[in-house]
Amino acid sequence: MTTARKASAVIIAGVVVGLVSGLALGVVWWRLAPRVPLVVQPGASFPQGYQPEGYLAADAAFGALAVIAGVAITIGLANMRREHLFSVLIAALLAGVIGTAAMWWVGTRLGSVDIQGLSATTTTDVVVDAPLKVAMPGMYVMWPIASALVVTILALGDWISEVRSARRGR
């Protein structure tokens, strides 16, 4: 197997694993994240009481799942192709972007309510669970950052190992 073929195999594996794990983690996020009660009135909707901790907890759950996935998947990809960390980095970053998008898409779609439609058709106040959302945009880059950090640590470890073996060889 050629070097380019091995690198492309790691990249394809990263994309596939990122997509599948992102879809699965979207379901996990949907089940773990707390919901904020939303009061829907004719023509308007607003949170029932101000509850920023609900949004913060949903974002924290999203970020924690993303970091765990980034570390685990990057370690798995590095085991596939440890001698060429650049392809591992590309695969891990692609897995992070695709996995984060899939996780967000599934988590926000499951259990969501058409708030505007409900508001237009209701005649009394209705309390529903607000759909999940990521309030802090920084959560979207947690998976790629965790992946890049793992590759950086692996590269640093390889470099330190090479420096030590070069010093012993003198």
Regions found by a protein language model. Give the residues of each.
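Membrane-helix interfacial "entry" motifs
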Residues: 2-14, 50-59, 80-84, 88, ...
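Cytoplasmic membrane-interface segments at the C-terminal ends of transmembrane helices
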Residues: 2-11, 34, 72-92, 108-115, ...
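Hydrophobic alpha-helical transmembrane segments
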Residues: 11-16, 54-68, 89-94, 126-149
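Hydrophobic alpha-helical membrane-insertion segments
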Residues: 14-29, 90-108
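Interfacial/capping segments of alpha-helical transmembrane domains
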Residues: 26-42
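Perimembrane loop-to-helix junctions flanking transmembrane segments
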Residues: 37-55, 120-124
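Juxtamembrane non-transmembrane "cap" segments at the membrane-aqueous interface
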Residues: 99-123
